[in-house]
From Swiss-Prot:
Keyword 4Fe-4S in annotation: no
Name of the protein in its database record: Origin recognition complex subunit 5
Family in the record: Belongs to the ORC5 family.
One annotated Gene Ontology cellular component of this protein: nuclear origin of replication recognition complex
Keywords: ATP-binding, DNA replication, Nucleotide-binding, Nucleus
Cellular localization per UniProt: Nucleus
Gene coding for it: Orc5
Length: 460
């Protein structure tokens, strides 16, 4: 098992502790496995990739049969059981047919009678929360499968939810829980920086026909240059998105824009401040389109900003949200980009006179770099979100379950994201932030007839 863990650690940086814990829990096939392991964490934390690689190495180096499936693909219990049996008992071929959990357990018991000594079985189920929608006995049986089949078998469940969400009235067997926390900023930069050589080779291939640019690229694109770029990139993106695959994809897209003035010879590769001024606008435009996969036409690359804005407008106009959800989205944007101390002046009609002071006048003379709409979103509480929502909505609406469910819909669509307290929504300690940009919310405002700029401190 030590050899397996050692081979996986270079492939999954910053996950050494999780790999070591998983190795200690599983051990060798000659040792007794735990009956079930629950691996959970947010998307982009490496659950699926790590488990798949771990099972693959166990299958190669040990006397273990493995099965890995995605519960989303299994729309019936029968399909899921047949996929599992096909992986765990490949010698049987088409003879294996199961209709329910009882048949599945019986087939595995037959495997116990014919299995090789010290043979182990590992089953991994991705998106395990979907098991709750299947037959009522599926999840309890999977958790006790080792006991029922008399096999050295372990079921690894993968999900984004904590295991408390799985409990029902009849109860479930105890399970070993392993949490994969989100990467911090330094870890994210280390992971993104680990593919430097691959990114550099792609750039060299891209400029292979242009000798002048190829020479500049070979000299300028060093590991320090790439790390400086990632540092600037994460200063914009890290608060809004911590999904590593998504960040990796967006970072590669924006690198060519960052490199452009260096290739033209107008900016030195070590002049980070000028490179930041060049890349700041495109990075903020890309931030409004993260997860959306909006591509620029190749023939219009030069008109970068105009194309991005046009794509955002089209997306905002075609976004089919309920009427109140659009106002909730506007309220979330206002809460993310206005200071809480300004709420009374912005949303209360009779807030009293405000004296003009020189300090206030100077503070309002903001440059583009200091405007809150370009600095990125700030977190806010649900109480503040609802207070702004009721302030900007002309009609009176009761606080119903339907209204609160629309907040979770916006989170599911990645228009809002949780910063903290995701499990404590009803207690009021949860904090969110708005992930959309100014151009997007202005178009939403036009659809519902609301002037967003009028309620933004940056434009007052």
């Amino acid at each position: 098992m030590e050899a397996i863990c050692s081979s996986l650690e270079p492939l999954f940086p910053c996950r050494e502790a999780a790999i070591e814990t998983l190795g200690e829990l599983i051990g060798d096939s000659s040792e007794t496995y735990p009956s079930a392991i629950y691996l959970f964490g947010h998307s982009g934390t490496g659950k699926t990739a790590l488990t798949r690689a771990f099972l693959k190495e166990c299958g190669k180096r040990q006397n273990v049969r493995t099965a890995h499936l995605n519960a989303i693909e299994c729309y019936t219990t029968k399909i899921m059981l047949e996929i599992l049996l096909d992986s765990l008992a490949p010698d049987q071929g088409d003879a294996l047919k199961v209709d329910n959990m009882l048949d599945f357990v019986e087939q595995l018991r037959r495997q116990a009678a014919t299995r090789v000594e010290d043979q182990g079985f590992l089953i991994a189920v991705d998106n395990a929360e979907r098991l709750r929608d299947m037959d009522a006995n599926v999840l309890p049986v999977l958790l006790r499968l080792q006991e029922l089949t008399n096999l050295n078998l372990c079921v690894i469940l993968l999900s984004q939810l904590p295991f408390e969400k799985f409990y029902n009235k009849t109860g479930l067997s105890e399970i070993v829980c392993l949490h994969l926390a989100q990467y911090n900023k330094a870890e994210t930069q280390r992971i993104l920086g680990s593919d430097f050589q691959q990114v550099r080779n792609q750039l060299l291939e891209q400029f292979a026909q242009d000798k002048k640019r190829l020479e500049i690229c070979q000299e300028a694109v060093t590991e320090d240059f790439y790390n400086n770029y990632l540092n600037l990139f994460l200063s914009v993106f890290y608060k809004a998105c911590r999904d590593v695959p998504e960040l990796q994809l967006t970072a590669r897209k924006c690198l060519s824009t960052y490199l452009e003035p260096v290739l033209d010879g107008t900016v030195d590769a070590t002049d980070i401040s000028r490179l930041w001024r060049h890349i700041a606008g495109p990075l903020r435009s890309a931030l409004t389109q993260i997860y959306m996969r909006i591509e620029k036409p190749a023939e219009e690359v030069e008109d970068f900003t105009a194309i991005e804005d046009q794509s955002v407008r089209k997306l905002a106009q075609s976004l089919e949200l309920p009427y109140y959800a659009k106002f909730l989205l506007i309220a979330a944007f206002l809460a993310s980009h206005n200071a809480a101390k300004q709420d009374k002046r912005l949303f209360v009609k009779h807030h009293g006179k405000q004296r003009k002071r020189m300090q206030t006048v100077n503070a309002r003379a903001k440059t583009t770099e200091k405007m809150s709409t370009t600095l990125g979103p700030k977190s806010f509480s649900i109480d503040r979100l609802l207070a702004i929502f009721y302030a900007i909505l002309e009609e009176k609406v009761g606080l119903t379950c339907n209204l609160l469910s629309q907040i979770s819909t916006l989170v599911h669509l990645n228009l809002l994201s949780f910063v903290s307290g995701e499990q404590n929504i009803m207690e009021g300690s949860a904090r969110l932030q708005c992930t959309i940009g100014l151009e997007f919310v202005l178009q939403i405002g036009k659809v519902v007839g609301f002037n967003v700029r009028q309620y933004l401190c940056d434009f007052m």
